[in-house]
A protein has these predicted regions:
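Sequence context surrounding c-type heme c attachment/ligation sites in exported
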Residues: 10-59, 88, 93-186
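Post-cleavage N-terminal segment of exported redox proteins
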Residues: 1-9
C-alpha cells in the first residue's frame, strides 16, 4: 500500500517516536544504526528494542506486545511508511554524508562548493528559521528531516514529501548533485 500525506499505516506496535526522541533525547541514528553507513536505514530488531525494554515499561500494553514478540522469537511486521519505487536506488549513507556537517545556507548550491553549502529549502526543513548566509551545523540525524519530516514530533509516522522523481530531481538540482538517470536508476 502507498499512503498519502498526513496519514500512515496502523503498526503492530504503536511506537511513540515522540517519547523516544523528545522525552529521552535519542536521535535517529541510535535505533536506525546503519543509516549513516549503508544504503538502508534499517529497522531495529526486536532484540535491540528489548535491550532497554526488558526493564523499562512494565505498565505499557505496547511494551508487553514487544516482549511477546521477543519471547516467541518473532520479528515485528512493521508496515513501511516511506517508499520509493523498486527501480529507484536511494542510498541513505550518501545523502547523510552530503548534508551533514557545517553548512552555509544559500539559495542555490554552487557546484564547486557542494560540501560546504545547503540549499535554503532543505535548511528550513531542519532549522525552520534558517536564513541565507547563516552557517548551520547539521547533525546526521537532522538530515533525516529533509525527506522524512520531524518524525520525532509524530505520534504516528506519516509521509510528508511525495518522494517522486520530480521531488528528487529538484533537490539534486538545488544542491548541484548529479541528475543523470544512472545516479538513481541502476
Amino acid at each position: 500500500d502507498i499512503y498519502g500525506f498526513n496519514e500512515g499505516p496502523e503498526q503492530p506496535i504503536a511506537f511513540p517516536h515522540t517519547k523516544h526522541v523528545q522525552e529521552l533525547g535519542l536521535d535517529c541514528t541510535f535505533c536506525h544504526r546503519t543509516v549513516a553507513k549503508e544504503a538502508s536505514a534499517s529497522i531495529p530488531s526486536v532484540e535491540f528494542c528489548v535491550t532497554c525494554h526488558k526493564i523499562i515499561g512494565d505498565n505499557s500494553e505496547e511494551i508487553a506486545k514487544l516482549r511477546s514478540y521477543n519471547a516467541n522469537e518473532k520479528p515485528i511486521d512493521w508496515q513501511r511508511v516511506h517508499r520509493v519505487p523498486d527501480h529507484v536506488h536511494f542510498v541513505h549513507e550518501a545523502h547523510i554524508r552530503f548534508f551533514s556537517g557545517s553548512k552555509n545556507v544559500v539559495n542555490t548550491v554552487d557546484r564547486n562548493k557542494v560540501s560546504s553549502q545547503i540549499a535554503l529549502d532543505d535548511a528550513i526543513r531542519i532549522y525552520p528559521n534558517a536564513k541565507v548566509g547563516e552557517i548551520i551545523d547539521v547533525k546526521e540525524s537532522q538530515v533525516c528531516m529533509t525527506c522524512h519530516g520531524d518524525v520525532g514530533s509524530m505520534t504516528k509516522v506519516k509521509q510528508i514529501r511525495p518522494l517522486k522523481m520530480a521531488d528528487c530531481v529538484n533537490c539534486h538540482r538545488d544542491n548541484s548533485a548529479p541528475t543523470d538517470c544512472v545516479t538513481c536508476h541502476y
